[in-house]
Amino acid sequence: MPDTKLPEELEALKLTIRNIVENECIPLESEYLSNPPQENDDTGPKGIAETVLGIVGTLPQEKWDHLEQISKDTGIYTLFVPEKYGGGGMGALGHVVMDEEIHRSIVQIPTSPVPMMMIDSCTPDQEEQYLIPSIDGKLNYAFCQTEPQAGSDPGGMMQTKAVRDGDDWVLTGTKMYISGAASADFLLVQAVTDDTKRQRGGITMFIVDNPSEGLSFEPIRIWITPTKSQQFYVNLDEVRVPQTKV
């Protein structure tokens, strides 16, 4: 029979995360659940967390900071960031091990909000301005692909367009169900640049700073929770993006 035991280093990782979850995260669950976001809170500040279970609650900022520091001290924070950026370079099996343990609590250990789609595809200037600060937790981003008419087939049905105008691109369209969009420092927006090629080379990703002229957000309520979620419509009304942010 094949050996199904985890490698020794992953067993150690599993134990480390389990101890943090049991001793730091689970004891905060009651406080988290008893403090839903305020009704007029549309931006999703750092003190609000949304879990995959659709349960939304809040904790004081200092408690999130405490969990984040534990995550950084143990190396969990950048566990899957490539080694060349100072991370652990952990693979898929390690990801599974971590997810299994982290999701034992609805209060989850913070990890680096690294935009993986930028790794090995951004320019040196973009790396310095956006990627590395994101890895360090200094910037947050939101990935904008899904649209009202383009969910399961974004390549074929995407309506957001980007038109070249001199040294800029002009983006027009609407994205939907975008997590954390309003509070993000920048957005990674997919838009059609060649309607004939589309997913075969005609869809481009743009870095859109938040705020930008013509960029706006509308919060979306999710039926599984009575509180306001961190899901948003992202409206792009002739938002100009320089070629340097493609």
Question: Each predicted region: which residue ranges?
Answer:
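Amphipathic, small/basic residue-rich leader segments at the start of a protein or domain
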Residues: 1-110, 129, 133
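N-terminal glycine-rich flavin-associated loop
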Residues: 108-129, 152-154
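Flexible, small-/acidic-enriched active-site or ligand-binding loops
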Residues: 157, 213-242, 246
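A structural signal for short hydrophobic beta-strand segments in well-ordered beta-sheet cores
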Residues: 160-163
